[in-house]
């Protein structure tokens, strides 16, 4: 079966109704090894694989971040065709935000901690779009990576609280050869910034080993100070 591309939710829904259900992989495009790993996991399920590409404006704190987000739709389509997915959904803004969802977004209090402390409204924007995709597609499974762990936790909480039937499938973080987690935004990093990101990963990995080996608090704090210096 050749991959079908949909840009309108109504024609997509007609197609989905012919199936037993879908395994959904939501993305914002700029596909990399991490995304492709999710797609491969999805293809192992008994349902049709549906990938979405939608750069969600609601989850960006700055308009400049939204505009600079890496986009290469032709390359993304080529990669997905190669993996022989069933459906690709590239919705318009109206498709996603042109209706009132039945479920209100449940935002757990932990959304204001960690990453949420510095990215006001980000997680609300993520949950808003995920909630809308779920109402449109009603997927059996949703495949998400552990890379954005706080985001994953909040989506799971929303699904649990709203008693949504879609099941979350957690997939491992895929990394570059230097240890940095695969991310579309890595394209925006300079060589020196990429080196810093790689060093941070290796320091954290080292710190984890030391904690497991019951190293003294003094030695652990020394590593922490070195990590802070890296930025």
Identify the role of each PLM range.
Residues 2-230:
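Nucleotidyltransferase catalytic core that binds NTPs
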